[in-house]
Amino acid sequence: MKTALSKGQFVVTAEFYPPKEANGSEIKERALVLKDVVEAVVVRDNPLAQVHTSPIATATLLLNVGLAPIVQISIRDKNRLAIQSDILGAVTLGVKAFFCLEDCHQRVGDNPGAKGVFDLDCVQLISIMKKIEHSLVGTRINPFAHPLELHLVNLSKKINAGVDFIQTMPVFDLERFKEFISLIKGENLYLLAGVRPIKSWQALQSMSQMVIPENIVQRIKNSPENKQAEEGIKICVEIIKALKQIKGVNGIHIFAHDWEEAVPILVRQANLK
């Protein structure tokens, strides 16, 4: 992925949630769906504050099938000793890319009584990750957050700490996204715009915290139930094609951890491969 970005290629990455049980076969099967259509996947660390298989164990299996992992290290669950040990272990196993984000609080997960550690913040963690020679380090930002100025201040700190690329939360409102792009113009980092295919009207209703224009809402709502997934793919492809034309966008990150079979469809229909 680092080579692709440096060459100016339009990069495609995707989310990868490790399974909630010990199931190496599932990891390999899902990896094969994504292997030839994305440059890398972000392997999440107990996403949504729920117990999942270790991201480092998952990343090892992904490497074995030829899929490049970007390993998230959670600041919520480990102190700085454990974090540095995990990073060294991951590098020893062949991991070259890492990801840092402020994840869900443990109270919203499946172990609400768990103790949050938060020994480091994301800026400090990025600094540690960048000590690894030839590492690639990413983080995430919400272009539609309010007030955005505070998030941009935090992003500036991460850039100063050495972050190489940012992924955004899913983009549906292209005009507001362009405003965000204008605010970070000139920053020395790569940007992957987030996209998310809408699988159904029910799925759309669970996305209430995202900024989704009314015309997109109506397109899904007015589609027959058996055609909603198809319409969701069509909308996502339209957004991808528009994003590719925006200066400063170096690629896309596909949020489809619960619908991974949609990823190769999106990539093919958007003419990305």
Question: What are the residue ranges of the model-derived segments?
Answer:
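N-terminal beta1-alpha1-beta2 module of alpha/beta enzyme domains
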Residues: 1-46
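Active-site-adjacent beta->alpha loops and helix N-cap segments on the catalytic face
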Residues: 1-3, 23-25, 47-61, 79-85, ...
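Short, acidic/polar
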Residues: 20-34, 55, 80-87, 147-156, ...
